[in-house]
């Protein structure tokens, strides 16, 4: 779920509830696909993640936010600043925004360290992750816009001993 170039207007509050649908059909549970799909309300009942968030427009180009996600019981705070806005006459041909988010997982300690041999001290900082993104966008026509989203994610704790910041591979379930 990528962010867009848009920010919340000054003195406006945006409340969102996001829902990521789960599996619509599991052949191991029900051989009849239509029955299973209807029973799970076409994936609605099998939510893989639910999130609520509040975003507030400090200015027309600065938004701050807080949120909570079901996945890993994560609370987060975010900020988005748009220093450059595209003009209709293409005098300024693109918009640029910077987005940053800090997350904290509140899941139980035994769940946080599940599946690993723990031979180190528990550290509260293991629960924190950081995300930063530069959003570069241009509306080319009435029906076509493009975005370029270089991003950086750092987790203070991962199960495998790989570089926590620079490896895009994410096979450890975190």
Predicted segments with their positions:
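Transmembrane beta-barrel domains of Gram-negative outer membranes and organellar outer membranes
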Residues: 1-121, 128-132, 138-140
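Detector for outer-membrane/organellar transmembrane beta-barrel domains
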Residues: 119-174
């Amino acid at each position: 779920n990528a962010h867009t170039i848009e920010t919340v207007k000054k003195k406006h509050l945006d409340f969102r509830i996001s829902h990521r649908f789960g599996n619509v059909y599991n052949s191991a549970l029900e051989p009849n696909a239509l029955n299973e799909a209807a029973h799970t309300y076409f994936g609605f009942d099998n939510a893989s993640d639910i999130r609520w968030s509040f975003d507030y427009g400090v200015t027309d180009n600065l938004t701050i936010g807080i949120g909570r996600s079901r996945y890993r019981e994560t609370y987060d705070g975010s900020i988005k600043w748009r220093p450059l806005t595209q003009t209709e006459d293409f005098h300024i041909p693109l918009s640029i925004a910077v987005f940053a988010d800090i997350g904290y997982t509140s899941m139980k300690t035994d769940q946080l360290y599940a599946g690993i041999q723990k031979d180190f001290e528990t550290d509260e900082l293991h629960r924190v992750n950081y995300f930063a993104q530069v959003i570069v966008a241009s509306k080319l026509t009435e029906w076509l816009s493009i975005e370029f989203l270089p991003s950086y994610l750092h987790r203070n704790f991962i199960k495998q001993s790989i570089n926590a910041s620079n490896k895009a591979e994410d096979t450890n379930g975190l």
